[in-house]
Structures are given as structure tokens and as C-alpha cells.
């Protein structure tokens, strides 16, 4: 899959792309593979299971499942990565999560080298429950806006009032 010129321009300006249904035909097997990693992890982790009280994370994640790992080479993902990063891009890491509550806004990367994050949401999410919120332009590391944003609103406490006098969930963002 090659991105269109419009998609590339959109990404360069806003810092994100959204592909709902891109893996619609594969999502059942992706979900089963995701769940199997958790079953395997729980059996080797003194039986600890996600109890729904706090976020649970496994890192690295897809590396533990041959099928999920093969998605890195799937033409849909590889095409996106190649178009944005070039043919010599490097896969760095993966994580699998069960989320609980809100996650405060944060920047995933602060490296000067162009990076992307590709995420699969296996549960239904809405703008009010669980979705990813993207602040357009926040991806431009070193940019005045991105720097001011990071200095002003990065918090680990979702109930903390920001320097702007608003709650973290009130920061203007695009809900995906």
C-alpha cells in the first residue's frame, strides 16, 4: 500500500493518519493472537491477570507471536512505513496494553529522527471512552508549538489542572 500525495501531506502537517478497517478481514485473528499472548504471559507470570484496576502492559509484544510479528512485513503496514520513513526504516519495539481510564496526553517520541507509531485498537472506542486523541502539529519536534505544548500539558495525573486552567481531557485534540 502506497500512501497518496494527499495522505503524505496530511501526515506532514498534522502528524497522524487514520485507517479504520484497514485490517478488517484480519481483525479476528489479530485479536485471538493478542489474547493468546496474554494467556501465555499470565501462565508464566505467577498467574497474574489483568484485573481491570490498573493498566497492564507487555513489552515487547508482537515479538512473542509469529503471526503478529509477520504484520511488520504486511504490504499495508510496510507501505505506510516506507512511504513516510523510506525503505531503510527500522522497527524498534511493540507493546500490548489493557487500558483502564484515561491516559494523559504525552509525546511517544522526542527524537529528532522521523518516527511513526502504528496502533491497532481491538475494542470499540469512542471520543468519550478510550480513543486516541491527537494534537495536530505536536509531532514536530523542536517546533515552538510542540515544545510549548509539551512544557505546558505533559502530566501523569489525569485529574491535575493544567497551567492552562483546564483538565487534561479538555485539551483541544482530534479524537480518533
Question: Locations of the language-model features?
Answer:
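Non-heme Fe(II)-dependent double-stranded beta-helix
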Residues: 1-14, 18-114
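Hydrophobic alpha-helical segments
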Residues: 29, 34-40, 120, 137, ...
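Double-stranded beta-helix
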Residues: 43, 129-176
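Short, charged/polar surface micro-motifs in flexible loops or helix N-caps
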Residues: 87, 99, 124-127, 140
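Short, structured patches in soluble enzyme cores that scaffold and shape functional sites
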Residues: 95, 107, 120-124, 136
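Glycine-rich, charged/polar anion/phosphate-binding loops
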Residues: 104-105, 119, 169-170
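Short, conserved beta-strand element in jelly-roll/cupin
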Residues: 112-127
Amino acid at each position: 500500500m502506497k500512501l497518496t500525495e494527499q495522505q503524505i501531506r496530511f501526515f506532514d502537517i498534522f502528524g497522524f493518519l487514520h485507517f479504520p478497517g484497514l485490517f478488517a478481514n484480519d481483525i479476528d485473528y489479530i485479536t485471538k493472537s493478542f489474547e493468546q499472548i496474554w494467556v501465555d504471559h499470565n501462565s508464566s507470570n505467577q498467574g497474574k491477570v489483568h484485573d481491570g484496576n490498573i493498566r497492564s502492559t507487555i513489552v515487547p509484544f508482537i515479538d512473542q507471536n509469529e503471526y503478529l510479528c509477520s504484520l511488520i512485513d504486511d504490504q499495508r503496514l510496510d507501505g505506510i512505513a516506507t512511504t513516510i520513513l523510506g525503505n531503510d526504516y527500522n522497527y524498534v519495539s511493540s507493546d500490548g496494553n489493557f487500558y483502564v481510564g484515561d491516559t494523559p496526553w504525552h509525546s511517544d517520541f522526542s527524537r529528532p529522527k522521523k518516527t511513526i507509531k502504528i496502533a491497532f485498537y481491538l475494542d470499540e472506542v469512542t471520543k468519550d471512552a478510550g480513543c486516541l486523541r491527537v494534537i495536530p502539529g505536536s509531532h514536530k519536534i523542536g517546533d515552538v508549538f510542540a515544545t510549548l505544548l509539551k512544557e505546558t500539558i505533559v502530566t501523569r495525573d489525569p485529574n491535575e489542572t493544567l497551567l492552562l486552567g483546564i483538565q487534561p481531557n479538555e485539551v483541544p485534540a482530534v479524537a480518533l
